[in-house]
Amino acid sequence: MGDIEKGKKIFVQKCSQCHTVEKGGKHKTGPNLHGLFGRKTGQAEGFSYTDANKNKGITWGEDTLMEYLENPKKYIPGTKMIFAGIKKKSERVDLIAYLKDATSK
């Protein structure tokens, strides 16, 4: 299991410019991530997704996020997320631990 505090720092550094996590949080360039786990791709209410995201059809969980966050454009070709990915597995594990905690409160 990852370190939630380390994951929070990674989120602030690499994700928070485009995403929020709190319930009722606003969409920015990217969607609010509250309720992410167990939700299908392209389903955050009120956010305009690419067809690539809507049509991917996977459900977000630890395994799918682990693969996606390594290389988003490879996992969902056509996504508009402008992010190169996180190559270090330990950083992805920490970020996912934080997201699992923060998006469910």
From Swiss-Prot:
Pfam families: Cytochrom_C (PF00034). The keyword Transit peptide does not apply. The lineage of its organism: Eukaryota, Metazoa, Chordata, Craniata, Vertebrata. The gene is CYC. Binds 1 heme c group covalently per subunit. Signal peptide: none annotated. It comes from the Eukaryota. GO terms for molecular function: electron transfer activity; heme binding; metal ion binding. Keywords: Acetylation, Electron transport, Heme, Iron, Metal-binding, Mitochondrion, Respiratory chain, Transport. One of its GO terms (cellular component) is mitochondrion. It is found in: Mitochondrion intermembrane space. It comes from Gallus gallus (Chicken). Belongs to the cytochrome c family. The modification N-acetylglycine is found at residue 2. This is Cytochrome c. SUPFAM superfamilies: Cytochrome c (SSF46626). Electron carrier protein. The oxidized form of the cytochrome c heme group can accept an electron from the heme group of the cytochrome c1 subunit of cytochrome reductase. Cytochrome c then transfers this electron to the cytochrome oxidase complex, the final protein carrier in the mitochondrial electron-transport chain. Heme c binds at residues 15, 18-19, 81. GO terms for biological process: mitochondrial electron transport, cytochrome c to oxygen; mitochondrial electron transport, ubiquinol to cytochrome c.
